[in-house]
Amino acid sequence: MSDDKKIIFSMQGVSKIHPPNKQVLKDIYLSFFYGAKIGILGLNGAGKSTLLRIIAGKDESYQGDVVFTPGYSVGFLEQEPELDEAKTVKEVVKEGVADTIKLLEEYEDINKQFEKPEVYEDPDKMEKLMERQGKLQDKIDSSGAWEIDQTLNRAMDALNCPDEDKKIEVLSGGEKRRVALCRLLLQKPDILLLDEPTNHLDIESIIWLEGFLNNYPGAVVIVSHDKMFLDNVT
C-alpha cells in the first residue's frame, strides 16, 4: 500500500514516565508520510527505543495521542528480537516470505490435483482448476516467487547470517539480530522500525543495508548511534 501524499502516522504530545518517576519522553510530536526516512539520535536512556516501541504498538502506557492509519503493516527490529529457539536459521528467515511460500505450495497442490482421475476425466473440474492455476501463476510471476531460494540466499549472504542449518538456540546475540533483520527486510512491511540495525554488522553488510533502505518504498524510522549511517539513509 502506498500514498506518498498522506500522513500515515501521527504522534501528538506523547510523554512516557517509568516508575517510580523517571520521565523518558516529554511532549513528543511526530508525523510522517509513506516513504519517509527518519533518523532518531539521542543519549543513552533518552527514550529512543521506547519511542519505537510506542510507534510499533508494543507500549501503550503513555500519555498523549498516537494515530495510525489503518491498513499499513509495521515491522519492528528490537535490540533483543524474539526468535523460535527450536528452528534453524533458514526456517526463521523463511518466515519473512511466508505468503510467497504459500503461493508455491498451493501451485504444487494444484499440479497434484491434475493427476487425479476424478479431475482429469471431468471437463468442468479441469476447467476450474486450470483457471485457478492461471490466476495463481500470475501472482507467482508478479511476486518473483519462482526465484525465492535465490532471494533468501542473497539476503542471508548480504547480512552475513550464520549457516542456514544452525539452530537459533546456539547463536550469539549478534547472530540472532542479523537473522531477525534478514527476516524483517524480506517481509517488506509498509513501515520499518529499526533499533540500532548496524549493531553486529560488518562494513560490507552496512553498505548493503544503506542501499536497501535508500531504495525501500515504505517508511523507515531508525534509531542509531551511527551518524554516518543515518546521514546516508535519512
Where are the regions a protein language model picked out?
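ABC ATP-binding cassette signature C-motif
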Residues: 1-234
